[in-house]
Amino acid sequence: MKYPTFYKSLQDYINLSEEDYLALEDKVIVKRLENRDFLLREGQTSKYLPFINDGLLVNYRVDESGDYHVMQIRWTGWWLGDLFSFFSKKPSFFNIVAYKPTEVLLVNHDTFNYITKNHPIYKKYFRIAFQKSYVGTLSQIYSLHSKTAEERYTDLVKNVPSLLD
């Protein structure tokens, strides 16, 4: 097993056989990013679902005034991609950038379609993962509208102290 963090993340949601795991492990694309490297730029079409095997990614947009708006922050063991762009094959509204050296495992369209068709356990996994992503997004939207930036930062550091490492 080359990616124990990835395996554990999958096992957290589904009972994965070694055969099912290896079918995906053999097809992921490994990409290493340095601090401030872009994984995706606004206007590009997302070709991958990225799993953060190690590191930290931030999803943000820049408005017409040049102000930055952070949409999501995710770290080791999470997925962070632009699902809209990936599934619609339309340009992204967001940037995704590494905020420390980061290794991502990329799942492209062909791999996603192959594993969900030939290894049905992944349908369950991605349904659960997408549900959690949706719930997290709703929670973040609520937080953006009900808390100050300082309160959101305090919550983040309290809930994920490893971000300060």
Describe each model-derived feature in a short phrase.
Residues 1-29, 85:
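Cyclic nucleotide-binding regulatory module and flanking cytosolic helices
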Residues 12, 37-98:
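Cyclic nucleotide-binding regulatory domains
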Residues 15, 49, 103:
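Localized chelating/binding microdomains
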Residues 19, 29, 33, 57, ...:
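Generic structural signal for secondary-structure transition and capping sites
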Residues 22-28, 36-43:
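Short secondary-structure junction/hinge motifs that connect adjacent elements
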Residues 31-33, 74, 107:
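Hydrophobic residues at beta-strand termini and immediately following loops
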Residues 97-165:
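Polybasic "coupling" helices that flank or enter modular domains
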